[in-house]
Amino acid sequence: DFGGGIGTHALANAMSSKVEHVFFVDINQTNRNFVEYRAKKLGVEKKLTFCKTIQDTQILKFDTIVCLDVLEHLADPASQIKNFRGIMDSNSIALFNWYFYKGDKNEYPFHIDDSQIVEKFFETLQSNFLEVFHPILITTRAYKKIR
């Protein structure tokens, strides 16, 4: 779970018997501490590892990447999804969503909506990933990398 925030998706996945282990990656130490506290309260702390960066996980390939409500906050979201592609194998799935919009009255001031950045993101997405059906979360899109 990249940019996992308060841990909603990481904890839900950790509670699933179908999930072996979850890596919660967030640059914010307060978030990591809070989710670790929640994991202990829920009894799933052994199924989670808390990291500041993807590199800190020391995992070369992931089965699933969850990145929700994060890409629109990055200066170069295209580079990030290229990085994700590099840590996926041919059967991996990435769950993404985004909202590249600052709002009509700057309601979302921390969102990226520069047209060149957004266009580069979509070009990168479409040339590196294939959208696939998934029953996991209807507000996201699931992608596998193009071989």
Task: State where each predicted segment sits.
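A short glycine-rich, Lys/Arg-flanked "PGG" loop and its adjoining helix->strand segment in the class I
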Residues: 79-90
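A conserved beta-strand element that flanks and buttresses the S-adenosyl-L-methionine
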Residues: 66
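Conserved SAM-binding strand-loop segment of SAM-dependent methyltransferases
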Residues: 44-54
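Conserved beta-strand/loop positions that form the S-adenosyl-L-methionine
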Residues: 2
